[in-house]
Amino acid sequence: LVGNLRDVDGARIDRLDAVLLTHEHADQCHGIDDLRALVIRHRQRMPVHMDQVTADIVGRRFDYCFEGAGAYPAILDKKVDLEIGQVIRIDGVGGPVNILPLGQDHGSIPSLGFRIGTFAYCNDVVRLPEETLERLGGLDSFVVDALRYTAHPTHASVSQALGWIDRIKPRRS
């Protein structure tokens, strides 16, 4: 699991089947160029899944990655297919993976969390709507944002995260 795209090189990742963007903030996507090495190695464009709001912003900001520019070919395949509560399937070398996008509040903007089987990932979140909390039952593992001990306008505090954990009762968090 890569927390943001700038971590790809440092994590020594040899292969990715797809990228899921939670939202358009720089800490999530300002490393998208680092996918170029993987794309060249595997000789196929990288599918990048996102919601419409993210696609509008990231598509403009990194148009050269999605559309190509001059002598540089496009390296990414923009997939605007993430909708809250609608499962998408990603086929990869390890087999198909079903991913459920989850709605969450990141303060000034919405962001997405993801549930994959009995695993859920909810970063960059300050509030989880009731609908999302209901979709988080029965988890083995829950990765959740907790920026600091005190309140923050765009990130959960430790006490908020512990409250969600107490409510949904994952085996690990």
Locations of regions flagged by a protein language model:
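Active-site environment of divalent metal-dependent phosphoester hydrolases
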Residues: 25-29, 57, 107-108, 127-130, ...
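Structural motif
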Residues: 18, 118-121, 141, 172
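Cap/insert and terminal regions of metallo-dependent hydrolase folds
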Residues: 127-173
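Active-site flanking residues adjacent to catalytic metal/cofactor-binding acidic residues
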Residues: 22, 123, 144
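Core dinuclear metal-dependent hydrolase active-site scaffold
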Residues: 1-14, 77-134
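Active-site neighborhood of divalent metal-dependent phosphoester bond hydrolases
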Residues: 42-46, 54-80
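Active-site metal-binding motif and surrounding structural segment of the metallo-beta-lactamase
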Residues: 1-50, 139-141
